[in-house]
Amino acid sequence: MLLPFREHLDFGPTPYDLLLQKEGIPIVRGNVVDDVTTLELGKWERMGVLGCYLNLSNQQRTDAYVCEIPPSSQTLPQRHVFEEIVYVAKGRGATSVWQDEKSKVTFEWGPGAIFAIPLNSTYIHFNGSGSEPIRLFVGTTCPAMINIFHNEDFIFRNPFNFRDRFHEGDEFLRYNKHVTDRYWETNLVPDVNHFPLDDFPMKGKNVKHMRYTLGDTTYGCHVSEFPPGCRSTFHRHGPGAVIIITQGEGYVVLWRDGEERQRHEFKVGTVYSPNDLMWHGHFNTGKGNMRHFAMRGDSPKYSHDRFRNPAWTMIPMADEDPAIQREYVEILKRNGVEAAVQVVED
């Protein structure tokens, strides 16, 4: 018997909801954003740039935002007791991060880079281009921290330095450790589309995957690669996942028990986020590999999950509606892709 989805409860605005209202920038809701590089943004006083929140799936533990740094500009210095993982959706720039002036580290990045801000470190993002803006897609644990402490002084003006999470000097960029299959610890990945992933044969032929602990965060993330003609099984989990397409094309199918399936096309720059316990499956319809970058759950280094019941979290292909597979095969044929479909048990 499958675990039913949880009912929505509303006891009024949470501390995080109130923070979003106070920030005064647009808030995008729903499940899917077509392209983060074209979203309408607003003036963000705290950051000193343009931005919008992506409060997809009404998340209250993790969330995301998009910020745009104009040419020859920079963000205001930021410091906060919540974690951030940054994906560079557009442009080239640099980030300075420090706990004190002696420990300041500056590194450059370009499209497709991912990195984390060490907890409660001060940082500034820079745009060195005189003509092109930068867009950053950022996942955060802000909702959980604000909802627990509901005190902005503690979150944004806390002097404590987490020295165990900060690699000073050259060590910040030198720190790279391939811990085991499909798991890497580092502070910066220059380009998720060119970073070598490990084979994941139990997920499907030619499927590749890598989980990361970035910047010693507890916030989890991973990159998955689906070859042509490849799709995932339908799976579900708790709220908080945000997924951005970094390479290729296809679609995602979303639904909850008792509701109709929704199909959403995706391309590079599309972001989607399933609701709590919402079934979802990823489908590659292109002639090349499809990669996505997902932020959700705990990082491998600090995961405290100890139990999982696959019967509650995945639908074997033999048990799904046959129309799903037939539709996929027909789309592949129209696109000139071999219809020998590989199914990824995700």
Predicted region positions:
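A short, N-terminal "cap"/entry segment at the start of jelly-roll beta-barrel domains
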Residues: 1-60, 151-218, 222, 322-346
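Conserved short histidine dyad/triad with adjacent acidic residue
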Residues: 46-52, 63-80, 205, 222-237
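Short histidine-centered beta-strand/loop micro-motifs
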Residues: 53-56, 74-80, 97, 106-107, ...
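A structural feature that tracks compact, well-ordered secondary-structure segments
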Residues: 64-69, 126-128, 221-225, 231-232, ...
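Glycine- and acidic-residue-biased ligand/ion/polar-headgroup-sensing regions
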Residues: 70-71, 80-100, 227-228, 237-257
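Histidine-centered metal-chelating micro-motifs
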Residues: 74-76, 94-95, 113-125, 231-232, ...
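A short hydrophobic beta-strand segment most commonly corresponding to one strand
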Residues: 85-87, 116, 131-150, 243-244, ...
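Short acidic-glycine-tyrosine-enriched beta hairpin
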Residues: 99-118, 256-276
